């Protein structure tokens, strides 16, 4: 019997954004991302490459206002797609963690796909904006993602000076933590409750 593909397509349209995401968890890291926010595209491309996820993402947002709605809504839709692609989560490892360096920067991420939304985020950035992405939105991105992923995320920049390096290390740590958490390691739902 063939395994069912772990994939999802999610569309969300509001007065602020129009977003379509197609995600495959068991991919090869290819992506086509156009969020309208250049640095967010770069981070999501890195995330997919290192997690091994395939992602097509299109967002048409009210960037004439600022990047808030686009960044937040991209995270909400991506989190929903991850949740849908995971199905009942049978056989997944559930937990993942990684510590990733990028030059002088060092970031840590731990993930629990256990069905409870929570985000602990510890990082400070010197630059307020990088290529259209307000750095204050990095935390908001991960908080919004945790909400619709129904996951607990702990993210922390442990060292570093360069804002680009610190944010990229966070996204790559998240990628490797997610790669582990979604990996199939058994047949059962990884919880004594019998569901997550």
UniProtKB/Swiss-Prot annotation:
Gene Ontology MF terms: imidazoleglycerol-phosphate dehydratase activity
Keyword Cytoplasm: yes
GO CC annotations, alphabetized: cytoplasm
EC number annotated for this UniProt entry: 4.2.1.19
Chief location: cytoplasm
Subcellular location per the Swiss-Prot or TrEMBL entry: Cytoplasm
Assigned keywords, A-Z: Amino-acid biosynthesis, Cytoplasm, Histidine biosynthesis, Lyase
Pathway assignment: Amino-acid biosynthesis; L-histidine biosynthesis; L-histidine from 5-phospho-alpha-D-ribose 1-diphosphate: step 6/9
Gene Ontology BP term (one): L-histidine biosynthetic process
Keyword Cytoplasm: yes
Domain of life of the native organism: Bacteria
Catalysed reactions listed for this entry: D-erythro-1-(imidazol-4-yl)glycerol 3-phosphate = 3-(imidazol-4-yl)-2-oxopropyl phosphate + H2O
InterPro entries: IGPD_sf, ImidazoleglycerolP_deHydtase, ImidazoleglycerP_deHydtase_CS, Ribosomal_Su5_D2-typ_SF
PROSITE patterns cross-referenced by the UniProt entry: IGP_DEHYDRATASE_1 (PS00954), IGP_DEHYDRATASE_2 (PS00955)
Top EC class of this enzyme: lyase
Pfam families in the record: IGPD
Family in the record: Belongs to the imidazoleglycerol-phosphate dehydratase family.
Protein name as catalogued: Imidazoleglycerol-phosphate dehydratase
Species of origin: Chlorobium chlorochromatii (strain CaD3)
């Amino acid at each position: 019997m063939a395994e069912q593909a772990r994939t999802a397509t999610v569309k969300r349209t509001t007065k602020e954004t129009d977003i379509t995401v197609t995600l495959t968890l068991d991919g090869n890291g290819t992506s086509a991302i156009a969020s309208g926010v250049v640095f967010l595209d770069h981070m999501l491309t890195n995330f997919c490459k290192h997690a091994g996820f395939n992602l097509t993402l299109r967002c048409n947002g009210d960037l004439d206002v600022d990047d808030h709605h686009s960044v937040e809504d991209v995270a909400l839709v991506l989190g929903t797609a991850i949740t849908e692609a995971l199905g009942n989560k049978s056989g997944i490892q559930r937990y993942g963690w990684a510590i990733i360096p990028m030059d002088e920067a060092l970031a840590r991420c731990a993930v629990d796909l256990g069905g409870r939304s929570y985000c602990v985020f510890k990082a400070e950035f010197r630059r307020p904006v990088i290529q259209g992405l307000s750095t204050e939105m990095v935390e908001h991105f991960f908080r919004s993602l945790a909400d619709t992923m129904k996951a607990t995320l702990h993210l922390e920049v442990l060292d570093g000076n360069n804002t680009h390096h610190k944010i990229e290390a966070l996204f790559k740590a998240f990628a490797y933590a997610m790669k582990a958490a979604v990996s199939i390691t058994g047949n059962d739902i990884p919880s004594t409750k019998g569901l997550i």
